[in-house]
């Protein structure tokens, strides 16, 4: 170990910064977060530091550095481009046994700054001892993605409750088990949902031995296919699941991110072949949660856009089961972005309408007259089976048969296919497309030939002649 990792209490302690430029400003911002009393030695200040001085956030000594300025200083940072001055600052500090840091000059440092993940009061510091700072930064970025921002609330509440827990539990082992259960159970779930008062109530119930073995349901949008489009929150919830109920639309790449020990149950439905009824899925969510399990209902795209997520949560709520919702990137947004088709464009479409091709059994009540108007984009989910009827209705209500259309099959995945043609050709294109597929109708489809970026470049056929672009 080249450096001993320490966490220093700088609240109201004097820290000297030699230098008044941008580098100094970055270090000063970190010192402010730690509550330090900052003194700056520099002939001039950057505009940012000048404003901080005017606001009374820093003290300014508008003079050259003198060793006497180190008297009663807790630590010092040299942030100038003058190597001679930096060396003098370090030597003077070292002589006085004051910790010193010369920015970007490790030999002249008695302490160094780590990469930091700040979830105060929880702070994670990462250091490569100055040998590989880029690697330390990459690790910090990974931890930023993995550690929920609400950890700060969790740690703060735990700090407030330490005394009460100690009064109730004399054994250190008993206290450890209490907190292990809290940090991985309902207390943590309530924190993640921002329900801080309820979280503290849960701690009180646990202390009183009234903890209920009640699970919860998390409705999570898995996105359109590319696992990279899964949200950080979605990943975090999936990593905590005891059981995952998923649809056929969820890609294998996303399923691979589920916690390894979690039970996986496919409740997917396909057109004309409903393997699990919706009622059975609803009841399964309730039953599993009542067993005390953390249940993730994983749905392709966004669960509240043609995903029946609202129906499922109504049943969960009626059963008194706690739940949360994690939005996902809906297929219309993800697939069109990967196909180079903007849903709106100032010159072509001032609105976009999302439509489902699966109609309720009591009939189709779509306003075809409104949908056939120009200067708008139609994004149709699950519409391949009814592509012929959709095309006929739009043309019958005034939409030009030469209106550009795209059928995007397996959008955002490595085997994505984009088929381009006209409204009159929609049925034929839909029959060729791999599923799941999204239908896009409108002038914005023409932009695909200019700004498609994912995989191979688009073919150069006319925007209104049939073309197939395999973006694998």
UniProtKB/Swiss-Prot annotation:
What gene codes for this chain? cysG1
Biological process (GO), any one:
siroheme biosynthetic process
Name the reaction it catalyses. uroporphyrinogen III + 2 S-adenosyl-L-methionine = precorrin-2 + 2 S-adenosyl-L-homocysteine + H(+); precorrin-2 + NAD(+) = sirohydrochlorin + NADH + 2 H(+); siroheme + 2 H(+) = sirohydrochlorin + Fe(2+)
- The UniProt entry annotates the active site at 247, 269
Q: What is its EC number?
A: 2.1.1.107, 1.3.1.76, 4.99.1.4
Q: Which residues bind S-adenosyl-L-methionine?
A: 224, 300-302, 305, 330-331, 382, 411
Region annotated Precorrin-2 dehydrogenase /sirohydrochlorin ferrochelatase, chain positions: 1-203
List the protein's name.
Answer: Siroheme synthase 1
Q: Which residues bind NAD(+)?
A: 22-23, 43-44
- The answer to whether keyword Methyltransferase applies is yes
Pathway noted in the entry? Cofactor biosynthesis; adenosylcobalamin biosynthesis; precorrin-2 from uroporphyrinogen III: step 1/1; Cofactor biosynthesis; adenosylcobalamin biosynthesis; sirohydrochlorin from precorrin-2: step 1/1; Porphyrin-containing compound metabolism; siroheme biosynthesis; precorrin-2 from uroporphyrinogen III: step 1/1; Porphyrin-containing compound metabolism; siroheme biosynthesis; siroheme from sirohydrochlorin: step 1/1
What does the record give as the organism's lineage? Bacteria, Pseudomonadati, Pseudomonadota, Gammaproteobacteria, Enterobacterales
Q: What does this protein do?
A: Then it catalyzes the NAD-dependent ring dehydrogenation of precorrin-2 to yield sirohydrochlorin. Finally, it catalyzes the ferrochelation of sirohydrochlorin to yield siroheme.
Molecular functions per Gene Ontology = NAD binding; precorrin-2 dehydrogenase activity; sirohydrochlorin ferrochelatase activity; uroporphyrin-III C-methyltransferase activity
Which family does the similarity line name? In the N-terminal section; belongs to the precorrin-2 dehydrogenase / sirohydrochlorin ferrochelatase family.
Keyword S-adenosyl-L-methionine part of the UniProt annotation: yes
